[in-house]
């Protein structure tokens, strides 16, 4: 029931679907006259990038301040989370390299459909890698001086800043449907439905990567490291995985994840909470895979050769930028612009992915929840 006089809020998922359909219709009716709507779509990316840089900084620092992780358990959790993320990125990059886009789509035509140059290009460029290094150094310093009055005051200030930035990002995310409408109107107005095969290929690429990561890599970890039956694990994990797919958030799925780990999988409460509560700031395999795939995909669309060093940088940025953003709305979308821009790829490509991001966001959440549960089982094996 809703209070009298108040209309029920339309779910964001439904808003995004309606915006996609409405944008396609508007573009087909307006034709080239809808091109100006692409500028509005890129303005959304500009604002998101401006918020994302300080958000990543304070999120990493806050993780150091608030996380309580015993060293013995950290020696298992941290390397395992890093290994999972690297494997996820490697799968994404491998699939992206194996995909001959030019066979399916007229890439030269699509490059002309990207929204115009970003206003953010006229702002001072920020090196995300140095932002992350500064955040790590600040977090380590606060952790080393924990208990002192200045450290406590600064820690509280960081927590307050994180809450404010998350609220601002939440406000910006509410206008995602408008950005989706704008980019769909521009693209369909300029090329009809030529963009849809490209988006379909991208969705299949990411979905295939996540399926390989979950069904093959996690199965290997369960069988040979955690000494658990993968078939039984995935049967027990059905509830939290379906919940994550439905709500699109690993954090919102946390109560179901914990209940499944402790009651159905018989994982100890300590291991379950360490992996699913503390580890939720680290286990972002879905986001890492998505962003690595997106970066290589954009590079192919724009015919930009990414050398090995740049690909390693993509992986590093995706992993480090995801630390501490578990509770941020549309976390993968928030950090995507930073990763894309961090390796010199055109930010104009980001709005082109917006029409399918709502769908992939649910796959990201499901992969992240699976990661939490696999890590919990491995931790319990070495308890």
Residue ranges and their predicted role:
Residues 77-88, 200-217, 236-243, 312-325, ...:
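Small-residue-enriched core segments of transmembrane alpha-helices in multipass membrane transport
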Residues 71-77, 167-171, 264-280, 308-310, ...:
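Membrane-interface alpha-helices at helix entry/exit sites of multi-pass transporters
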Residues 38-46, 156-171, 232-243, 259-266, ...:
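Short amphipathic alpha-helical coupling elements at transmembrane boundaries
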Residues 47, 82, 86-90, 207, ...:
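Hydrophobic transmembrane alpha-helical segments of multi-pass transport and channel proteins
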Residues 7-28, 45-48, 72-231:
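Signature of multi-pass transmembrane helix bundles
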Residues 239-322, 376-377:
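Helix-loop-helix junctions within the multi-pass membrane cores of secondary transporters/permeases
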Residues 1-60, 66:
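Anchoring transmembrane alpha helix of integral membrane proteins
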Residues 292-383:
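Transmembrane alpha-helical segments and their short flanking loops
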